[in-house]
């Protein structure tokens, strides 16, 4: 066992004055009240477990990742989430656009393989995340804001978490801390994806001319020399605009690039621009996403790239599937089983690997031009592409998905000297 893992398993009582026989504060401690954490908390609470959620931020708070996929619609239904006009904009698919060549092509979810929903939503993340948090609270979760985690671990008796103001114990720990990825940092198990996007610069507009997008209100994925950009219509005539590239970016890349293009100029004419933000080094996977009494979920387990809007979908679906395995184990006292989540990880790895294969081709080949701007793909291939774009990536009858997975296996296979 590595030094990092040995430190990780050091009992709490060895480093604090807390009574080692103190009662547990919860069955499950969840770090983070974002989409993955709130989903896990809601579904566990619904089944009668005591769930404590520790969130560092106050809600509502702004986030990107505003375009959802049909693959999460069953989870929203399971949670009892009802779309609201102030939070949701109907999304029927995606439109890929190259302004330099004046080419574009629309992909509608209704053309995917049978099984997935035919639409999704764009959401105001501040309100959407708050709605998910409120649902967890309504089902019985104890959600505490302003809780910055300073230390965490597991021992023979359970899991423990220290914040800047308190200490907590539980039977199980779920890390849904997003890009903070507390477990991965603790165990030094965050492995970057080096062939994906490196940085993103983005902003929002109020009173934008979103009606110029036409009747569909699909996300626009703008193919650009430096990478790609997004244009997402949000409720209340708001607009989310950003650029992603493999190299370093700054505000000039946004202002002199995507925002200077004809579509953005029309959409933002007369609109009020809000703060510009920059994020970088966000693509990674946690190579030890679970163990006895702990698991990572959502972005804390893996984040690929924003290009195909997979993050929130994988977070909600992953959290729901995690609960389906964890809840029976908690009832039976099996939560310390090191092999508890083996089958779950195989399932999630199929989803991650599918999107990773798509993202890698997008950045490193002429895939985007051939598939997304190349005209007629043929019915079978188009349905397969649409199913992946819809986040329906847990199926075994999609030949396009099989192609992506086979290509990744070949690239990762060891070569002879």
Where are these regions (language model features)?
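C-terminal helical "tail/cap" subdomain of flavin- and related membrane-associated enzymes
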Residues: 5-10, 327-417
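Beta1/beta-strand and adjacent pyrophosphate-binding region of the FAD-binding site
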Residues: 20-34
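Predominantly flavin-linked oxidoreductase catalytic cores and closely associated redox partners
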Residues: 135-265
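A conserved beta-strand/loop capping segment in the N-terminal third of enzymes
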Residues: 77-128
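Glycine-rich FAD pyrophosphate-binding loop
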Residues: 45-64
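N-terminal Rossmann-fold NAD(P) dinucleotide-binding loop
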Residues: 37-38
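FAD/FMN-dependent oxidoreductases across multiple families
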Residues: 9, 88, 249-341
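Conserved hydrophobic helix-helix packing surfaces used for dimerization/oligomerization
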Residues: 28-30, 51, 294
């Amino acid at each position: 066992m590595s030094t990092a893992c040995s430190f990780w398993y050091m009992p709490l009582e060895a480093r604090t004055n807390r009574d080692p026989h103190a009662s547990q504060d919860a069955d499950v401690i969840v770090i983070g009240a974002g989409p993955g954490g709130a989903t896990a908390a809601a579904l566990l609470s619904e089944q009668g477990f005591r769930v404590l959620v520790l969130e560092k931020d106050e809600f509502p708070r702004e986030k990107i990742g505003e375009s959802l996929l049909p693959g999460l619609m069953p989870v929203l239904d399971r949670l009892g989430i009802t779309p609201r006009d102030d939070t949701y904009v109907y999304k029927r698919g995606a439109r890929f656009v190259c302004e330099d060549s004046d080419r574009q092509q629309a992909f509608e979810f209704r053309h995917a393989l049978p099984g997935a929903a035919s639409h999704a939503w764009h959401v105001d993340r501040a309100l959407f995340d708050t709605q998910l948090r409120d649902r967890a609270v309504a089902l019985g979760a104890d959600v505490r804001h302003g809780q910055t985690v300073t230390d965490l671990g597991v021992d023979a008796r359970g899991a423990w978490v220290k914040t800047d103001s308190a200490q907590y114990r539980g039977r199980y720990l779920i890390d849904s801390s997003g890009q903070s990825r507390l477990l991965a940092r603790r165990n030094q198990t965050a492995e970057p994806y080096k062939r994906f996007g490196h940085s993103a610069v983005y902003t929002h507009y109020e009173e934008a001319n979103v009606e110029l997008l036409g009747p569909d209100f699909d996300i626009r994925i703008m193919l650009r020399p430096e990478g790609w950009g997004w244009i997402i219509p949000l409720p209340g005539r708001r607009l989310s605009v950003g650029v992603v590239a493999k190299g370093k970016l700054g505000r000039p890349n946004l202002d002199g690039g995507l925002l200077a293009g004809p579509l953005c100029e029309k959409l933002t004419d007369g609109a009020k621009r809000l703060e510009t933000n920059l994020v970088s080094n966000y693509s990674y996977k946690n190579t030890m996403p679970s163990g006895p009494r702990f698991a990572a979920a959502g972005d804390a387990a893996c984040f690929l790239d924003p290009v195909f809007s997979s993050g929130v979908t994988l977070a909600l679906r992953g959290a729901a599937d995690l609960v389906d395995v964890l809840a029976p184990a908690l009832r039976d006292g099996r939560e310390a089983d090191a092999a508890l989540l083996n089958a779950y990880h195989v399932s999630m790895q199929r989803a991650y690997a599918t999107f990773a294969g798509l993202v890698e081709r997008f950045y490193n080949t002429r895939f985007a031009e051939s598939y997304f701007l190349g005209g007629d793909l043929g019915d079978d291939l188009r349905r397969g592409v649409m199913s992946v774009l819809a986040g329906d990536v847990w199926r075994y009858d999609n030949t396009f998905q099989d192609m992506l997975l086979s290509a990744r296996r070949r690239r990762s296979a060891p070569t002879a000297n």
